[in-house]
Amino acid sequence: MTNNEIIAATDGSSLANPGPSGWAWYVDENTWDSGGWDIATNNIAELTAVRELLIATRHTDRPILILSDSKYVINSLTKWVYSWKMRKWRKADGKPVLNQEIIQEIDSLMENRNIRMSWVNAHTGHPLNEAADSLARQAANNFSTRSAHIPGPGWTERSAK
């Protein structure tokens, strides 16, 4: 870790998979965001959290460490994406890559940026992961009950530690 590296946790939640779903990214109490839908899968929610973090931070040149409890997301974005691109977005079995559109978008957002990803074990007390998990679950619950969803403050260089 460098001293100006942004450390952010991302998480997604789907109540029925597919069902009411939420996503969140979290840096600190002043720097986070969340959202969701009436129906989506957990993987779409997890990927959306990463995409939204990368969009929010697109104007910073600081390195970013993304913490995720989704091995699917980490493997998709750091390992499998290279072979999928070589195979024209087909898996080894010849079938199309699931969630291809959002994975392509994230891959583009990661281009020419210093982005690292690291897996964290879910629900083990990691403070950033727990915060992102809570916000994603709250967003999913808001969409489930059709309650108003209030997004977070988002990203500014000044607010991020």
UniProtKB/Swiss-Prot annotation:
Its EC number is 3.1.26.4. Mg(2+) 2 binds at D11, D133. One of its GO terms (molecular function) is magnesium ion binding. It holds the Pfam family RNase_H. It catalyses: Endonucleolytic cleavage to 5'-phosphomonoester. Monomer. HAMAP family: RNase_H (MF_00042). This is Ribonuclease H. It comes from Tropheryma whipplei (strain Twist) (Whipple's bacillus). The gene is rnhA.
